[in-house]
Amino acid sequence: MSQYSGKIVFFEGKCFTGRRLEVFGDCDNFQDRGFMNRVNSIRVESGAWVCFDHPDFKGQQYMLEKGEYPDFQRWNGHNDHMGSCKPIKMHGEQYRMELFEGQNFTGQCVELCDDCPFLQSTGFSKNCLNSIKVYGDGAWAMYEEPNYRGRMYIVERGNYCAFTEWQSENPNIQSIRRVVNYF
C-alpha cells in the first residue's frame, strides 16, 4: 500500500457551517490559507489526520479518522483553536515498535506489534517511556493514561531518542494503539 494524503475539511461553525478550508496534505498554518484558527466542526473524507491547536505542528495533538465531527468536543478538544494539520502516513500494514525506559534507547525494552490498553501489563515496569523506535509501516497513538485516554501523541516510522521528540512535556505513557482507519 502506498502513502495516501487524504482529504479533511474544517468549518468555522458547528455542524459544518460557515467558512470552510479543504486540506489534502500538510498544512502548517491555517492563517496562511486565509482561515482563522477557529474550527468548530470537521469532516474527514479520507485518510487519518493529526491536527494541532497551534501553527507549525505544535501544541495539543488530535487524531481524526474518517468521519464527521460536528463540534470540537467530538474530537476531545477543549476549545475551538486549531492551527495546523497533516495526514498520518501509512506505508503498509505491518506494525512494530520498541519502547525504552531510558533516553537514547537504554534501559528496559518492550516490543509491541498490537494495541496495548495498559503498558504495565506487558511487563514494562514503569509508565516512564523515554525513547522509542517505530519499525513498522503504520503509525501509533500513545496516550498518557490507560485505555487510550488523556493527552495523545502520534508517532510514525523512525527513531525518537527522547520524549520531547514526540512533543511531550513528560515521559508518562500508559497506553498505545495502532492507527488503522486510514481510508
UniProtKB/Swiss-Prot annotation:
UniProtKB keywords: Eye lens protein, Repeat
InterPro entries: Beta/Gamma-Crystallin, Beta/gamma_crystallin, G_crystallin-like
The keyword Isomerase is annotated on this UniProt entry: no
Top-rank taxon, per record: Eukaryota
Pfam families xref list: Crystall (PF00030)
Domain Beta/gamma crystallin 'Greek key': 6-46, 47-89, 95-136, 138-180
UniProt key word Repeat: yes
Biological processes per GO annotation: lens development in camera-type eye; visual perception
MF annotations from Gene Ontology: structural constituent of eye lens
Function: Crystallins are the dominant structural components of the vertebrate eye lens.
PANTHER family found in the cross-reference section: BETA/GAMMA CRYSTALLIN, GAMMA-CRYSTALLIN N
Subunit structure: Monomer.
Protein family per UniProt: Belongs to the beta/gamma-crystallin family.
Domain notes: Has a two-domain beta-structure, folded into four very similar Greek key motifs.
Name of protein: Gamma-crystallin N-A
Name of the gene encoding the protein in the UniProt record: crygna
